[in-house]
Every structure is written in structure tokens, then in C-alpha cells.
Amino acid sequence: MAENNRAVIKLKEKFAASILDVREFRGEVTVTVAREKVVDICRFLKESLQYNLCTDVTAVDYLGKQEPRFMVVYNLYSIPNKDRLRLKAGVPDADCSIDTVSCVWNSANWLEREVYDLMGVQFNNHPDLRRILMTDDWVGHPLRKDYPLQGPDREPYKGRLS
């Protein structure tokens, strides 16, 4: 049960008002947190509970399905405890930003850049938030649900690709 998970118990003790939901599916625990507390919660997970590896940062676009529109998802792993934890934080379309966790895990740096590039989520205080996959002159964020399926009307890229 997710409620008996050590990390969930400790998170609820320290950040009760910021823990919005806890779920378990196929043995993996997902904790939804308030976006305003994401850095504090991540720092606590790393320093106190030994979640020393951020393996992935991604985002989901729920356009027309739920609010907030975006959900930023952090996949975390504790090497000493051999334990996984998924952390989620909602990000509204009107203020499509969340604080960076690259100050907690260096591995989040390029992962957040990818989310910014493809989904348009801004990571506040990120050390180098710029496109990482698309060209610098690319218009829009191609993994958003409202992005045109055929891409934007534009000239083919004439720059060097490799």
C-alpha cells in the first residue's frame, strides 16, 4: 500500500498541506505535490530519504481533459534503498512554469531543457534554459496537444543538422 511507504509517511509528516494525492499502481508509488513546494520536497527526498538519482523529468499535456493543463513528472530512485518514487506537480496553462530541480539533481538540467523545448514548460531559475532538440528558430512546442499535426507553416530548415 502506498500509505505504508516510508517516503510517503515522511512526506506527509513534513509537507502535509503540499501532498495533494498518493497512488500506487503495479507497485510504483506516485505522489502529487503542490508546484510551489517542489524544490523543498525534492531536496528533502534527496537529503533525508536518499533519493539520490533523478532518472527522468517529463510532462503530460491534458488539454481539455483536466486542470491544471500540464503535469510535470519526476522519476526518482534511491540507490541505497533500491526504491523508486514518482513525483508529479500540476502546472496551469496561464502560468506555465515551475521551479527547477537542477539545483537538487544535476541530472535534471538537460531533462528540464527537453521538457521546455517540446512542451513549453518554463523552469524558473534554470541555469541554461534554452532549446535542446529543436532548432533555435523553431516556433512553438511540438509535443503540446494544440500543436498543428503537420507542423507550423515555415520554410524547411537550411542549416547544418550534424
From Swiss-Prot:
Location(s) in or outside the cell: Cell inner membrane
GO annotations of cellular component type: plasma membrane
Pfam families: Complex1_30kDa (PF00329)
Assigned EC number: 7.1.1.-
Gene that encodes it: nuoC
HAMAP family given in the database record: NDH1_NuoC (MF_01357)
Keyword Secreted: no
Catalyzed chemical reaction(s): a quinone + NADH + 5 H(+)(in) = a quinol + NAD(+) + 4 H(+)(out)
PROSITE patterns recorded: COMPLEX1_30K (PS00542)
InterPro entries linked: NADH_DH_suC, NADH_quin_OxRdtase_su_C/D-like, NADH_UbQ_OxRdtase_30kDa_su, NADH_UbQ_OxRdtase_CS
Subunit structure: NDH-1 is composed of 14 different subunits. Subunits NuoB, C, D, E, F, and G constitute the peripheral sector of the complex.
Species the sequence originates in: Geobacter sulfurreducens (strain ATCC 51573 / DSM 12127 / PCA)
Membrane topology: Peripheral membrane protein
Family stated for the protein in its record: Belongs to the complex I 30 kDa subunit family.
Name of the featured protein: NADH-quinone oxidoreductase subunit C
Single GO MF descriptor: quinone binding
Keywords of the record: Cell inner membrane, Cell membrane, Membrane, NAD, Quinone, Translocase, Transport, Ubiquinone
Coiled coil spans: none
Function: NDH-1 shuttles electrons from NADH, via FMN and iron-sulfur (Fe-S) centers, to quinones in the respiratory chain. The immediate electron acceptor for the enzyme in this species is believed to be ubiquinone. Couples the redox reaction to proton translocation (for every two electrons transferred, four hydrogen ions are translocated across the cytoplasmic membrane), and thus conserves the redox energy in a proton gradient.
